[in-house]
Amino acid sequence: MLTPKGSAADTLPSAAEILATVRLQQTQQKIDLQGQLRQDALVVPFRLTQNGPVIRYSFTNPPETLQLRLGDTDSRLEELSQSDVEKITPAQFDRKVHGTSVTYEDLAFKFLYWPNARVVGEEPVRSRRCWKLELQAPSRESQYSNVVLWVDRQSGALMETEGYDWRGRLAKRFEVISVQKIEGQWFLKQMRIEELQPGTGKVQSRTYLEINK
């Protein structure tokens, strides 16, 4: 739980402190669940397993296993096969996951480690008090120049994320729609991912990431 420093109640924690809390929150799960990516008529089932900082997405049609390792200073997204482990490189970041709006970079959580970040203030998201952060990409390896985060003050959970292209236009939005309690812990139930037309803000595609108990 984030606790503002200092005597003043409205003193903001640093962006580094908030991001450290988000990373910690992301690595505290131990789960084995079923989920799906749903975009219009397309439904892509997957198995989601996590053991601390290692998160695995296992798809069956076609077969693909993606593994995310959340480290202290960086994350690593890998593609697993029966005989090999291949690191996902920045050149593959814009590759879409099974034809949905979700890309490899979106699964990699690289932005949680970007050093150029600042706290803008506090804004509510779905009645939750959230810190609002602006992050700047350290290089053009990312498809996003800037990312804006809304982080739940109490839990450190990501409630909403916006990614902007290299012309400063909103390109993608991730929003937690609902959560659920699994074995005494709150966990994502549904997230909406919207890919937007640059410059107009019109939604080009909408994908839902849904997790079942």
Residue ranges and their predicted role:
Residues 31-35, 46, 55-57, 145-147, ...:
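One face of beta-strands
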Residues 36-40, 58-60, 78-82, 136-138, ...:
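A generic structural motif
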Residues 40-44, 62-69, 81-88, 141-144, ...:
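Short, surface-exposed beta-strand/loop "edge" segments at domain boundaries and coil↔beta transitions
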Residues 2-52:
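N-terminal cleavable signal peptides for secretion/export
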Residues 10-20, 24-30, 72-145, 165-168:
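Flexible, processing/modification-adjacent segments and terminal tails
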Residues 129-213:
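Gly/Pro-enriched, hydrophobic low-complexity segments
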Residues 45-50, 67-70, 117-122, 177-179:
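Short, exposed beta-strand/loop patches in secreted or surface proteins that constitute
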